[in-house]
Amino acid sequence: MSIRAEEISALIKQQIENYESQIQVSDVGTVIQVGDGIARAHGLDNVMSGEAVEFANAVMGMALNLEENNVGIVILGPYTGIKEGDEVRRTGRIMEVPVGETLIGRVVNPLGQPVDGLGPVETTETRPIESRAPGVMDRRSVHEPLQTGIKAIDALVPIGRGQRELIIGDRQTGKTSVAIDTIINQKDQNMICIYVAIGQKESTVATVVETLAKHGAPDYTIVVTASASQPAPLLFLAPYAGVAMGEYFMIMGKHVLVVIDDLSKQAAAYRQLSLLLRRPPGREAYPGDIFYLHSRLLERAAKLSDAKGGGSLTALPFVETQAGDISAYIPTNVISITDGQIFLQSDLFFSGVRPAINAGLSVSRVGGAAQIKAMKKVAGTLRLDLAAYRELEAFAQFGSDLDKATQANVARGARTVEVLKQDLHQPIPVEKQVLIIYALTRGFLDDIPVEDVRRFEKEFYLWLDQNGQHLLEHIRTTKDLPNEDDLNQAIEAFKKTFVVSQ
């Protein structure tokens, strides 16, 4: 058998053509310093700001400081296994989190890794944690109400879909309870809720998850948690991760509520990172871009125009105050970014007014646009009644002789305070809220003793379920008040059955 040179050369050419190079080109640097959750690396010349990088022990990091001779990297995990001289590798991707329907009902950390012990999250889609907020032309004004189920909020400081409403108050004034009740009330409201817990005890987060599960909320809720024991970079990233997960649904035309509990702890974590990265400190040792930290996050909440699918992302950020001081640095920053604030006051909380909302300092800059027509009609005078009552309350306590009109104002105010009280985790449908506030503002409760008002309200709801379904249905479907004569007759009929306590 003779060997033919042409065949050999043809085979060699074929081999060369089919040869695939296995060489991988990657940008690799060397760790020159590590400690306190921060690493400095030399050699990552082309790394981007905010890019994810990988250390030799598979722990991820994020490039934050791009300096002349080195890169400052925050380590997103335990840093004890990283040492000087270790390799650090670029990924070429800006920091991103997994997104999608499969996250609903899960508890994840800010990197999207499950922490609930229910196995991996099956999703292939990701979104960068930082993205540009929708532009002016991509938005439309907020016009759909987000029903919280809390009378004091839905009547006095209404929240609309796509709004950013700050919840501010001292610790232990019921901020988290307001958020949980709002999430519970979104059942059957076509809403996806994301609860972001920053710097809280793991036991507290477990209690919140348990409460949500008890009320069937996991069917539409994602919990993102960066607990107090986690490294500061994860606390800093948590709200961005939560909003990125929400944006995925908003772009698909769905409605999303993101609760951020709370931004004070995120600001403290960012301050810690900035000081460790040797960025120059400013007021209260916060870095100069602390305002931008929160503004670029909250600007991503929006109500999209119909051309963009009409989805919305509503943000409820929390800020914790010290001794009720809302004029401190972080509170004033966030107040100026958001579309209003709900101020929870510890004095009211301890005096039994719960939710402890200070109606005078709380405001919604969207206002009536975020209320149904019926609520707008009945709740118009409520804020004035409360303000007048708070003013006259001091005089009434001294027992000084008051004229008839003032006495009537004080009596109405006391009943208003009672009606706005609410039990924990018992959100009330808006149609029932409208009817009890109608009864209050039209004077039907004026002859009911103050101590009986809460019982009157509970029994009135039960009576409506039995005998007033047509009234509730009318408000539900038309969003407007039924015929006032029918309403008055119904309330009078119930009052005849109500027994005042002796």
From Swiss-Prot:
GO annotation, cellular component aspect: plasma membrane; proton-transporting ATP synthase complex
Enzyme class: translocase
Reactions catalysed: ATP + H2O + 4 H(+)(in) = ADP + phosphate + 5 H(+)(out)
Keywords: ATP synthesis, ATP-binding, Cell membrane, CF(1), Hydrogen ion transport, Ion transport, Membrane, Nucleotide-binding, Translocase, Transport
Annotated site (Required for activity): 362
The EC number(s) this enzyme carries: 7.1.2.2
Compartment annotation: Cell membrane
Gene3D superfamilies: 2.40.30.20, ATP synthase alpha/beta chain, C-terminal domain, P-loop containing nucleotide triphosphate hydrolases
GO terms assigned for molecular function: ADP binding; ATP binding; proton-transporting ATP synthase activity, rotational mechanism
UniProt: ATP binding residues: 169-176
Classification via InterPro entries: ATP_synth_asu-like_sf, ATP_synth_asu_C, ATP_synth_asu_C_sf, ATP_synth_F1_a_nt-bd_dom, ATP_synth_F1_asu, ATPase_a/bsu_AS, ATPase_F1/V1/A1_a/bsu_N, ATPase_F1/V1/A1_a/bsu_N_sf
Membrane topology reported for the UniProt record: Peripheral membrane protein
A Pfam family annotated for this UniProt entry: ATP-synt_ab_C
Record keyword Transferase present: no
Family that this chain belongs to: Belongs to the ATPase alpha/beta chains family.
Function, in words: Produces ATP from ADP in the presence of a proton gradient across the membrane. The alpha chain is a regulatory subunit.
Quaternary structure (record): F-type ATPases have 2 components, CF(1) - the catalytic core - and CF(0) - the membrane proton channel. CF(1) has five subunits: alpha(3), beta(3), gamma(1), delta(1), epsilon(1). CF(0) has three main subunits: a(1), b(2) and c(9-12). The alpha and beta chains form an alternating ring which encloses part of the gamma chain. CF(1) is attached to CF(0) by a central stalk formed by the gamma and epsilon chains, while a peripheral stalk is formed by the delta and b chains.
HAMAP family named in the record: ATP_synth_alpha_bact (MF_01346)
Protein name, per record: ATP synthase subunit alpha
Lineage: Bacteria, Bacillati, Bacillota, Bacilli, Bacillales
